């Protein structure tokens, strides 16, 4: 029943998004983007209350912790999506269509990765320690890297697409596939979608690795991930412009990843409660936000 409720909510949100809010392909305003993201955030928080009533306080804490971690880790993802759109000169009126179908892909791929990951961890528990090393290494690396970049032209996926598919840079509305002279061509909207899906998969490995350390409950992991991504994609049209202003968020994320990594290593000796994980996550993110704001004053 819980899965039916979740998928019903997601289906309703997607229908609302594509069928009503973006039906006329108008560029959403900055204010509209903020309000829409706030709406998604409220829905996500209300779902957390549903988790609390049906699964208990600890599961609710795990849900909110996973939700916040996924939100934070997806910020770089949003920045790279912006780079992809700029590289292909995708008009703002068509960007939402790419993001929408990207969400559909995320819903499918995240399910596969999460279910597969849980099965592997249940069978090979030592894999958690490998994930812990990856998380700590990623956290340390995040402290040392000034900015993430994405070289589209030299990426393997881009080169493979250009080599194996007929690509046209002339758009015909929102079409991903265009037929000309009895020949099929793929538009840059399609290429953008494939690159974005690839980036989503790469980022999913880090984020899900972090979340596996919080809980191994498939329902909590999957629902928190999907709600977090839905909210961020709706905020894309303003977030892509302001994400760089919050320069200290990456340090918050680094602290969270290192904390989670060490949590895995010591869990046989010290069991860290869900409320501590949630407190560390919220405190770290607040530190990053406040420090970023103070730097601009």
Swiss-Prot record:
Subcellular location: Cell membrane
Keywords: Cell membrane, Membrane, Transmembrane, Transmembrane helix
GO CC term (a single one): plasma membrane
Pfam families cross-referenced by the UniProt entry: TerC (PF03741)
Residue stretches spanning the membrane: 1-21, 32-52, 72-92, 98-118, 120-140, 194-214, 218-238, 253-273, 274-294
Superkingdom, taxonomy of origin: Bacteria
Topological category with respect to the lipid bilayer: Multi-pass membrane protein
PANTHER family from the UniProt entry: MEMBRANE BOUND PREDICTED REDOX MODULATOR, THYLAKOID MEMBRANE PROTEIN TERC, CHLOROPLASTIC
Matching NCBIfam families: R_switched_Alx
Family as reported in the entry's similarity comment: Belongs to the TerC family.
UniProt-recorded name of the protein: Uncharacterized membrane protein RP786
Source organism of the structure: Rickettsia prowazekii (strain Madrid E)
């Amino acid at each position: 029943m819980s899965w039916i409720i979740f998928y019903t909510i997601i289906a309703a949100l997607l229908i609302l998004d594509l069928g009503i809010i973006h039906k006329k392909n108008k560029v959403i305003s900055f204010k509209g983007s903020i309000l829409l993201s706030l709406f998604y955030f409220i829905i996500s928080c209300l779902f957390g209350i549903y988790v609390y009533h049906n699964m208990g306080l600890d599961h609710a804490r795990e849900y909110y912790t996973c939700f916040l971690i996924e939100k934070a880790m997806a910020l770089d993802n949003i920045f790279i999506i912006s780079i992809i759109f700029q590289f292909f000169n995708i008009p703002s009126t068509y960007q939402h269509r790419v993001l929408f179908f990207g969400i559909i892909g995320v819903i499918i791929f995240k399910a596969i990765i999460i279910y597969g990951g849980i099965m592997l961890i249940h069978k090979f528990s030592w894999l958690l320690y490998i994930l812990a090393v990856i998380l700590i290494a990623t956290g340390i690396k995040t402290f040392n890297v000034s900015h993430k970049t994405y070289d589209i032209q030299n990426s393997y996926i881009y080169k493979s697409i250009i080599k194996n598919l007929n690509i046209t840079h002339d758009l015909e509305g929102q079409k991903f596939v265009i037929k000309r002279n009895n020949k099929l061509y793929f538009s840059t909207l399609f290429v953008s979608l494939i690159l974005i899906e690839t980036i989503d998969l790469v980022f999913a490995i880090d984020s899900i690795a972090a979340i596996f350390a919080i809980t191994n409950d498939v329902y909590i992991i999957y629902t928190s991930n999907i709600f977090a991504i839905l909210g961020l994609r709706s905020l894309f049209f303003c977030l892509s412009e302001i994400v760089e202003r919050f320069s200290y968020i990456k340090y918050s994320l680094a602290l969270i990843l290192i904390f989670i990594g060490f949590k895995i290593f010591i869990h046989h000796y010290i069991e860290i409660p869900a409320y501590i994980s949630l407190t560390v996550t919220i405190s770290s993110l607040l530190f990053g936000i406040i420090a970023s704001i103070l730097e601009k004053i």
